[in-house]
């Protein structure tokens, strides 16, 4: 059979960078490394689905494209659910508060579920922008533009902060055929990246407007 099971582990080898991410598949011929894990994690990605955003994360030294999904639905509970799979639970509550305060998008009476597709565990704050745009898309029942990737950390004042290795993230997205990127202004490339239109933003409201205007 060609069916595979995906395993993700941090390398402990002295010959690799600290926290290097290794992605492996168990096949009928045994365990093998995957040279292009983004293709695996995006293999089931469907464009133009409300609540779905593709982000470029950087675990170790490898840029990795991952789909982040959000579902926001009316709650019948006194304290609505806030559930995150593959992303930081406490950070989700903070991002919901930032969305409400700085973009006027409230979900105080709604359950919020967020998932990093494919079993990936994302630990870096550069996932913030993807999570917030996914939540906003689910609430507004509005899909993100086709071919869009995002990354960026959110501050409590609604600012979008830069992520490390921004150029590597953008080049990986372009290599995989993505055509638009919403990123922190400080990560804007010095020279254009072929095939990739970059929207550099300072604030959450700018990012939401860019996603809407480029649809």
What are the roles of these predicted feature ranges?
Residues 1-215:
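Peripheral, non-AAA+ core regions of ATP-driven protein-machinery
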């Amino acid at each position: 059979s060609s069916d595979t099971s995906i395993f993700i582990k941090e390398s402990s080898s002295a010959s690799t960078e600290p926290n290097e991410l290794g992605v492996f598949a168990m096949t009928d011929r045994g365990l093998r490394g995957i040279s292009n894990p983004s293709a695996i994690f995006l293999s089931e990605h469907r464009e133009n689905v409300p609540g779905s955003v593709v982000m470029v994360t950087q675990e170790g030294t490898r840029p990795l494209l991952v789909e982040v999904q959000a579902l926001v639905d009316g709650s019948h509970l006194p304290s609505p659910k806030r559930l995150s799979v593959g992303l930081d639970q406490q950070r989700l509550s903070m991002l919901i508060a930032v969305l409400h305060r700085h973009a006027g998008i409230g979900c105080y009476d709604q359950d919020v579920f967020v998932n990093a597709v494919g079993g990936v565990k994302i630990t870096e704050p550069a996932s913030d922008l993807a999570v917030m745009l996914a939540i906003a898309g689910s609430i507004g029942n509005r899909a993100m533009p086709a071919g869009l990737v995002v990354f960026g950390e959110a501050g409590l004042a609604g600012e979008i902060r830069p992520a490390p290795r921004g150029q590597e993230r953008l080049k990986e997205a372009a290599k995989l055929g993505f055509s638009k990127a919403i990123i922190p202004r400080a990560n804007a490339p010095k020279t254009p990246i072929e095939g990739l239109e970059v929207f550099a933003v300072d604030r959450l409201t700018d990012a939401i407007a860019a996603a809407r205007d480029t649809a």
